[in-house]
Amino acid sequence: MRCVPVFLILLGLIASAPSVDARPQTKDDALASFHDSAKRHLQRLVNARKCCPESPPCCHYFGRRK
């Protein structure tokens, strides 16, 4: 009988958890994700190149040091 309240609480938590999209990733999805990641990394390098000569702390933020 002591387990019933715990069981009900866990059941409520499971029911209120956000659902996960179990759809498998297609080739187009994977390619789009790869392109987004590449764009993000290139933008980070461009930003580092712009600010590093002016601000050494900026270089440290972008993972580059003088």
Swiss-Prot record:
Contains 2 disulfide bonds that can be either 'C1-C3, C2-C4' or 'C1-C4, C2-C3', since these disulfide connectivities have been observed for conotoxins with cysteine framework V (for examples, see AC P0DQQ7 and AC P81755). Pfam families: Chi-conotoxin (PF16981). This is Conotoxin Ca5.2. Its main location: secreted. Expressed by the venom duct. It is found in: Secreted. GO terms for cellular component: extracellular region. Belongs to the conotoxin T superfamily. InterPro entries: T-conotoxin (IPR031565). The cysteine framework is V (CC-CC).
